[in-house]
UniProtKB/Swiss-Prot annotation:
This is Germinal center kinase 1. The gene is gck-1. Its EC number is 2.7.11.1. Belongs to the protein kinase superfamily. STE Ser/Thr protein kinase family. STE20 subfamily. Residues 345-362, 459-468 have a biased composition (Basic and acidic residues). Residues 309-373, 389-563 are annotated as: Disordered.
Amino acid sequence: MTTTSSDELPRQADDDSMKWDRIYIQKLDPEVIFTKQERIGRGSFGEVYKGIDNRTGRVVAIKIIDLEQAEDEIEDIQQEIQVLSQCDSQYVTKYFGSFLKGSKLWIIMEYLGGGSALDLTKSGKLDESHIAVILREILKGLEYLHSERKIHRDIKAANVLVSEHGDVKVADFGVAGQLTETVKKRITFVGSPFWMAPELIKQSSYDYKADIWSLGITAIELANGEPPHSDLHPMRVLFLIPKNPPPVLQGSQWSKPFKEFVEMCLNKDPENRPSASTLLKHQFIKRAKKNSILVDLIERAAEYRLRTGVSSDSDLDEDSDGGGGTSKWDYPTVRGPRVSADDDGTVRQRTDRPRAQVDRRSPSGSPGGTIVRGSPQVAAVAEQLRNSSVGSSGYGSGGNSASSQYATSSLPQSHTASSGGATTITLGSPNGSPTSSLARTQSMVSPSGQRSGSAQSWELERGNRPMSERVSSQVSPSKYNQHRTSSSNGVQGGSGGRREYINGSGSGLNGNSSNQNHSEYSDAVRQRGPGGSGGRLDYRESHVPTSSQENLNHGRMYGYGAPPPSREANNVPMPRVKGALDCSLLPAIEHLSRTRHATAALDQLRHVFRDVEDSCPGICNELIEELMQRIAVPQVSQSDLDAAIRRLTTPPS
């Protein structure tokens, strides 16, 4: 093998961070040597394909990375190749070499056709005997890595791969770290929040014992199908793990040795946490059976993937949502700046490139995103969560939930357009959206649509008050209703109950002042590409304040053009007539919550429907009517359609 010169690879401003001379890259054409077959997943930095080595006929896994698109991840790619090339263990995925063709880097690895341990949990509950075998093999992999003074730092079921014959191997070394004689403990902030050790979250020095904590969380994940706190926002979990007692494995179906094993792994004091070698001697592990008992489980998972279309993956796959996956959150990996160690080139200082986005995924919102610790923004958010009170975790609730605080506060100051000390956000519908029956009704109520400056916009005051009191709103419902049917900025509910600001191309406003404010805000929040539906800001970066929705509600209830009532009047609860929300939507969501579709996103959807109905009474009825019209017409007669709508929107007598 020969090494390529640095000129053949993408250059960064800081050339010291690009020490590719320590990584062997072959100059041969990989498309000649390998036959690329179907895509089998998406890893840390690129797509993974099944392939054939034409020289030997061996089946391999091919990870293909576009280095031009993955510029921010080059050091992590470098780290993964470095660690893989140094490992030689039957419990760690094997690395066969790397090839560069143009800007595409081909990483050739061992193919494991059974998918991940996470895939095994998706096809059904795991028995304790299966879990014991998987944990034993992970422990053997960790024992090897720790003996080589390497920390994996991202142990979880998705990063444990299995072969079709029951072999279990540790994979995905994108955030692995090296312990040297001079650097015996790490101080960086990386890993997946749900599996992260308390000492790592607190940014204390840590060592290989952090992997043991992650193993304990993985044990609970294998038993329950999800890690502890999976119904909470990842940023809130970062606050809870150091503060709360360690999770415990609950359920009478689990044996006492299994529960004791988990308890030993989840000791909050790393000094009292056992090593991998010690845990291999534990009763629960010693009585584990042979790997062959996993074969039936692997075949069951393969049948499930064929039936549902869910692809296996070393991380969450973009396509898995469409195949019936039920993950409650995108379980992201936090990748942080590395502290440079000796001159062995393994651990390097990350460049100080600003990281404005919390989520690196494409605008389509594929899972498997990455929270970046490249700037102090995440640290500030985490510190705010530690200092703030923990409220309700429900989306859109009146209380100050930690996740809501994070979603609001994570929008950088530079991304907020201001005019006279206030921020203007204009609401509307996306381009080309059909005019609903609700919009037609509202446009009839307010035909003029002419209002003066402050009544045409939604102003968010920015001051030194708490976040929950920092918003005051002035809304012209007539302008809002007129603007809903124009091609402008819209608020939509995304998948998983998220709300997104979608930047439209048209102005949809009368008056230069409002147009200017709308343009300033659109430019401020546009972080992914130009206008249109492509320039979107995720719910986790911003959300619509509840107080603004309340003022919008009062604007509709108390007459168009009339000033909203005082805050004292806002506190008076308005009686709500039962309709489609209570008769159809909430019961349907409640039914789904008792099935395999029960997710945090479903709970958020329930809150969203309630918030929308509170803001605009009767809108759920309109929604049901609109849906029924689109589904039934012209196949169903109008009388039958009216009867069906009445059943869905009227309480039973």
